[in-house]
């Protein structure tokens, strides 16, 4: 029998709301208020998000972020910097105790990413899972060369034509798995790299060249322009098939929405942003 999960598309929201909603959904699942949930969303303004452990002032050119009019937010998940602009962002929130969820992060990535794999199939792309096979490849993941996400695929992230097309991060808190990630529609590589600090211009140019070889957006390889709506439809169906689930629409209570608002204040605060 097909399991029924919640589905919510919160549309285009500010970065603090986006991170607050993901954390709030984790809380609601942890407390048993709602069933597992898949969420889609986009960003307004376009935003640079940094990982929980990244050192903001050392790695990010904050003035450049402001100059370009981008938002800036710290995620509750690890990983590196991501420019959320022309993309579909997804989150999956499910109890660690769920019978289909493995106990290890990498294996849970694989299960959840089946939904992404099927979504790309629906758009006509033959994607596959990245599996770092050599010790050198695994060591590179432990010590990334840059602060920019998408410059190398991690375990079970999606790759097409040898380049990473979706980047995800996962955290486990309060007995719940939260995995969220970016499915790139288009990407502005120059803007992305301008917002990070590098030791010198030569290194920046080398990292940018490496990035172009390692990352790709949907419309870079599609024969026709794929819209956000087409992506939403493809990945909604993809998650249903990949996880063998069906959806019911999620409607939050007034009390739950108040919790989202309280968490939004947390993500907006300098104490959170400058915590590292």
UniProtKB/Swiss-Prot annotation:
Record GO terms (molecular function): lipoyl(octanoyl) transferase activity
Catalytic activity as recorded in UniProt = octanoyl-[ACP] + L-lysyl-[protein] = N(6)-octanoyl-L-lysyl-[protein] + holo-[ACP] + H(+)
- Tell me which InterPro entries the record gives: aa-tRNA-synth_II/BPL/LPL, BPL_LPL_catalytic, LipM, Octanoyltrans_LipM/LipL
Site (Lowers pKa of active site Cys) at 164
Source organism: Staphylococcus epidermidis (strain ATCC 35984 / DSM 28319 / BCRC 17069 / CCUG 31568 / BM 3577 / RP62A)
Residues of the BPL/LPL catalytic domain? 32-247
UniProt pathway annotation: Protein modification; protein lipoylation via endogenous pathway; protein N(6)-(lipoyl)lysine from octanoyl-[acyl-carrier-protein]
Q: PANTHER family this protein is in?
A: OCTANOYL-[GCVH]:PROTEIN N-OCTANOYLTRANSFERASE, OCTANOYLTRANSFERASE LIPM-RELATED
Any Pfam family hit: LplA-B_cat
Q: What does this protein do?
A: Catalyzes the transfer of endogenously produced octanoic acid from octanoyl-acyl-carrier-protein onto the lipoyl domain of GcvH, an intermediate carrier during protein lipoylation.
Q: Which UniProt keywords apply?
A: Acyltransferase, Transferase
Q: What is this protein called?
A: Octanoyltransferase LipM
PROSITE patterns per record: BPL_LPL_CATALYTIC (PS51733)
The further comment given in this record reads: In the reaction, the free carboxyl group of octanoic acid is attached via an amide linkage to the epsilon-amino group of a specific lysine residue of lipoyl domains of lipoate-dependent enzymes. The reaction proceeds via an octanoyl-thioester enzyme intermediate.
Please describe the quaternary structure of this protein: Monomer.
Q: Where is the active site?
A: 149 (acyl-thioester intermediate)
Q: What class of enzyme is it?
A: transferase
Q: Which GO terms describe its biological process?
A: lipoate biosynthetic process; protein modification process
Q: Family assignment?
A: Belongs to the octanoyltransferase LipM family.
Q: Which CDD domains match?
A: LplA (cd16443)
Gene this chain is encoded by? lipM
């Amino acid at each position: 029998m097909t399991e029924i999960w919640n589905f919510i598309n919160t549309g285009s929201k500010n970065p603090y709301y986006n991170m607050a909603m993901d954390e709030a959904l984790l809380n609601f699942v942890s407390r048993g208020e709602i069933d597992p949930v898949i969420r889609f969303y986009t960003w307004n303004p376009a935003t640079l998000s940094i990982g929980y452990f990244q050192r903001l002032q050392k790695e990010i050119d904050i003035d450049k972020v402001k100059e370009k009019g981008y938002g800036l937010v710290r995620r509750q998940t690890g990983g590196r910097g991501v420019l959320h602009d022309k993309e579909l962002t997804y989150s999956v929130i499910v109890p660690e105790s769920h019978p289909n969820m493995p106990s290890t992060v990498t294996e849970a990535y694989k299960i959840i990413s089946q939904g992404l794999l099927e979504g790309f199939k629906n758009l006509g792309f033959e994607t596959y899972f990245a599996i770092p096979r050599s010790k050198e490849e695994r060591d590179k993941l432990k010590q990334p060369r840059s602060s920019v996400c998408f410059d190398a695929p991690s375990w079970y992230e999606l790759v097409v034509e040898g380049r990473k097309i979706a980047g995800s991060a996962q955290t486990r808190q309060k007995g719940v798995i939260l995995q969220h990630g970016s499915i790139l529609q288009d990407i502005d590589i120059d803007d992305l790299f301008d917002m990070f600090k590098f030791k010198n211009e030569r290194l920046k140019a080398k990292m940018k060249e490496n990035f172009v070889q390692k990352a790709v957006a949907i419309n870079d390889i599609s024969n026709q322009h794929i819209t956000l709506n087409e992506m939403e439809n493809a990945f909604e169906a993809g998650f249903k098939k990949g996880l063998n689930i069906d959806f019911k629409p999620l409607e939050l209570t007034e009390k739950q929405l108040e919790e989202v608002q309280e968490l939004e204040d947390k993500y907006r605060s300098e104490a959170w942003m400058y915590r590292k």
